[in-house]
């Protein structure tokens, strides 16, 4: 079994490379052009930033890790809650739909998924800025140069109690797998976009959808603990954490202390902090 698992993970590594490389190349081209004309913080281009190799490593590690974590936790939860144990039976169960959410049109399920998970992630995000949880989230905040590549920098513990947990809860609640197939890439695009070095505020939609400037204030060294929303700033407006002063952009980022470079070093960093 261990050999089969090793083969599966190895194969998934190459599959991930096959999918991620065109994505990185495309995003690199798009944001190189856009940030050349409208940079939020002029300076070194993204391909010369410190920690470039570590950023790229996260783009390989995170998809593989979250894929197997979602599969394992979904199988465990389905067996515990619905008493379904066979892999094919589990797949059929979710494809056929269940519960009242599963009876809704897919577009309604999609809206429900976006709103509920964004609200939950807002509070999860706030919790990761507190106490012992911060050292795991600090991995994401460590770069002093925030770029689109920074979007994938997340510690496994942060992922587990963030997007992975939200996805599994919504799947168990009855949201169709087809919704995840469509909105998974959408969420990745939004996350990549808001980390880009662009002086874009969203204009008249700045209170409706997140923007690069909105999220850069979240990464700023001052003020701290602002703009936690992943997609809809309404949560920050409702709970007093919205911060986008007109005509201003943040200049300094990071956590104010050294973060070891390299994927493995950062994965063990919270255990030593």
Where do the language-model regions lie?
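Core segments of transmembrane alpha-helices
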Residues: 70, 74, 156-169
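Specific transmembrane helices
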Residues: 15-91, 106-121
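Transmembrane helix interruption/hinge and helix-loop junction motifs
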Residues: 172-180
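Long, highly hydrophobic alpha-helical transmembrane signal-anchor segments
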Residues: 1-10, 73-105, 176
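Cytosolic/stromal cytosol-facing helical appendages immediately following the last transmembrane segment
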Residues: 1-21, 25, 133, 142-153, ...
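Membrane-interface helix/loop boundary segments of multi-pass membrane proteins
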Residues: 129-139
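Membrane-embedded alpha-helical segments that form the functional core of polytopic membrane enzymes
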Residues: 99-126, 133, 181
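Transmembrane alpha-helical segments that form the membrane-embedded catalytic/substrate-channel core
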Residues: 28-37, 115-130, 185-201, 211-217
């Amino acid at each position: 079994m261990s050999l089969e698992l090793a083969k599966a993970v190895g194969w998934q590594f190459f599959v991930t490379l096959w999918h991620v490389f065109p994505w990185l190349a495309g995003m690199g081209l798009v944001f190189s052009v856009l940030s050349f004309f409208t940079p939020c913080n002029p300076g070194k281009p993204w391909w010369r930033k410190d920690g470039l190799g570590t950023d790229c490593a996260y783009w390989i590690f995170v998809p593989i890790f979250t894929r197997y974590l979602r599969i394992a936790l979904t199988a465990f939860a389905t067996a515990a809650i619905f008493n379904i144990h066979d892999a094919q039976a589990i797949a059929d169960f979710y494809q056929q739909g269940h519960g009242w959410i599963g009876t809704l049109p897919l577009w309604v399920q999609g809206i429900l998924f976006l709103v509920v998970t964004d609200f939950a992630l807002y509070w999860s995000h706030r919790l990761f800025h507190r106490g012992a949880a911060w050292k795991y989230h600090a991995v994401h905040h460590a770069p002093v140069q925030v770029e689109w590549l920074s979007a994938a920098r997340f510690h496994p513990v942060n992922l587990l109690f963030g997007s992975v947990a939200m996805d599994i809860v919504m799947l168990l609640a009855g949201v169709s797998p087809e919704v995840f197939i469509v909105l998974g890439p959408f969420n990745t695009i939004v996350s990549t976009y808001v980390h880009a070095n662009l002086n874009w505020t969203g204009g008249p939609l700045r209170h409706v959808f997140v923007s690069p400037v909105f999220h850069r204030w979240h990464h700023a060294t001052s003020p701290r603990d602002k703009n936690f929303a992943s997609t809809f700033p309404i949560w920050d407006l409702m709970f007093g954490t919205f911060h986008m002063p007109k005509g201003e952009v943040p200049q300094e980022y990071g956590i104010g202390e050294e973060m070891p470079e390299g994927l493995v070093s950062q994965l063990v960093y919270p255990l030593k902090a």
